[in-house]
Amino acid sequence: MIIKRTPQAASPLASWLSYLENLHSKTIDLGLERVSLVAARLGVLKPAPFVFTVAGTNGKGTTCRTLESILMAAGYKVGVYSSPHLVRYTERVRVQGQELPESAHTASFAEIESARGDISLTYFEYGTLSALWLFKQAQLDVVILEVGLGGRLDATNIVDADVAVVTSIALDHTDWLGPDRESIGREKAGIFRSEKPAIVGEPEMPSTIADVAQEKGALLQRRGVEWNYSVTDHDWAFSDAHGTLENLPLPLVPQPNAATALAALRASGLEVSENAIRDGIASAILPGRFQIVSESPRVIFDVAHNPHAAEYLTGRMKALPKNGRVLAVIGMLHDKDIAGTLAWLKSVVDDWYCAPLEGPRGATAEQLLEHLGNGKSFDSVAQAWDAAMADAKAEDTVLVCGSFHTVAHVMEVIDARRSGGK
């Protein structure tokens, strides 16, 4: 019976993903033993000659994207593994900046299914092994791995990184990673390796990160100590032990993440020209990260879902020229710090359009309204989006935020209507 249910290499990607979601008894099962065994069988523990691994509460995706952009501009063949995806599963694996066809993913899943035998794998472990297998097939120069959760026990940590990066430390996933910044810092520093650079972009670094670096013999490089940056209205400068780079173009991604990516790149020893650095920084962009998708009304997508990200988003919103009102379409997961996240956004949002998110982790619209005092509730993200767009005047701003899921739902609605001709 099990063989009948198991998809084949030619099965649709949707069939595989449904199979993977129900394969393991737990959605999250931190630990490296099972996934390491299967990786060894597949021969994917060294997916490329050079590997960056990027952990952090916020900023992982844009740090990875900046590294990818610069390295591609320098002529390297690059693969990136990131999560979660916004609209399509195939977003999780990029080779030379492009998604791979669904058939490549299903072929890799079939390889893993064959190799795993009776070893049980979570959805994320399966996806990580799949990415590593796809990278190995692509014969890349550099692979960039974005940690899923934490670091020490995350499936990506089966690979020994040549450069490890921790972008930021804030309270999120406390059920899994510990109740405070010190505990979370220790987990994230678990990706450090002996005699290898360990780049930290968090300006208020928990002491546990230094402890782990010392225990492992990693080469710690901290923002504000071994490297730093400064910003003006029209450009920025970066400095480290190698010297100073001046008049850099302002990035489209958050400034601290672009600087952290540059610190990691300069510590890597990989040969990259100053022109490639400039071109890569100027062109790095990632969907759903303060993404302005239209004007009149201005529409902004941002996946901010914890207080640290909401603080950054609030700053970006305040920097925009304000003519009309700000209407926020928001849905969140109930295991996030809803009160702390909304406390930041309240200062820049005039009207709230609250929606529930599906699934056991989704917060209800009413749970969001408890923290807001005023606002409208809707039965779905699509309804909240439609209402906000109907109410918005040309001079207003519609902000879609609160979760990857919220932004993804709105993107899907827009895509469906576009393709349906509505």
Curated annotation (Swiss-Prot):
Binding, ATP: G59, K60, G61, T62, N257, R289, D302
Gene3D superfamilies: Mur ligase, C-terminal domain, Mur-like, catalytic domain
Membership in a protein family: Belongs to the folylpolyglutamate synthase family.
InterPro entries: Folylpolyglutamate_synth (IPR001645), Folylpolyglutamate_synth_CS (IPR018109), Mur-like_cat_sf (IPR036565), Mur_ligase_C (IPR004101), Mur_ligase_C_dom_sf (IPR036615), Mur_ligase_cen (IPR013221)
EC code(s) of this entry: 6.3.2.12, 6.3.2.17
Keyword Ligase: yes
Protein name: Dihydrofolate synthase/folylpolyglutamate synthase
Names of the cofactor(s): Mg(2+)
Residue numbers binding Mg(2+) 1: S83, E146
Positions annotated to bind 7,8-dihydropteroate: D29, L30, G31, T122, Y123, F124, E125, L153, D154, A155
Upper classification of the organism: Bacteria, Pseudomonadati, Pseudomonadota, Gammaproteobacteria, Enterobacterales
Positions with a binding annotation for Mg(2+) 2: H173
Catalytic activity as recorded in UniProt: 7,8-dihydropteroate + L-glutamate + ATP = 7,8-dihydrofolate + ADP + phosphate + H(+); (6S)-5,6,7,8-tetrahydrofolyl-(gamma-L-Glu)(n) + L-glutamate + ATP = (6S)-5,6,7,8-tetrahydrofolyl-(gamma-L-Glu)(n+1) + ADP + phosphate + H(+); 10-formyltetrahydrofolyl-(gamma-L-Glu)(n) + L-glutamate + ATP = 10-formyltetrahydrofolyl-(gamma-L-Glu)(n+1) + ADP + phosphate + H(+); (6R)-5,10-methylenetetrahydrofolyl-(gamma-L-Glu)(n) + L-glutamate + ATP = (6R)-5,10-methylenetetrahydrofolyl-(gamma-L-Glu)(n+1) + ADP + phosphate + H(+)
GO CC, alphabetical: cytoplasm
Cofactor comment: Binds 2 Mg(2+) ions per subunit.
Pathway connected to this protein: Cofactor biosynthesis; tetrahydrofolate biosynthesis; 7,8-dihydrofolate from 2-amino-4-hydroxy-6-hydroxymethyl-7,8-dihydropteridine diphosphate and 4-aminobenzoate: step 2/2; Cofactor biosynthesis; tetrahydrofolylpolyglutamate biosynthesis
Species, as recorded: Escherichia coli (strain K12)
NCBIfam families attached to this UniProt entry: folC (TIGR01499), PRK10846.1 (NF008101)
Domain of life: Bacteria
Additional comment: Mutant studies have shown that dihydrofolate synthase and folylpolyglutamate synthetase activities are catalyzed by a single catalytic site.
Domains as described in the record: The N-terminal domain alone (residues 1-287) is sufficient to bind both tetrahydrofolate and dihydropteroate with the same affinity as the intact enzyme, but is not able to bind ATP and has no enzymatic activity.
A UniProt-annotated Pfam family: Mur_ligase_C
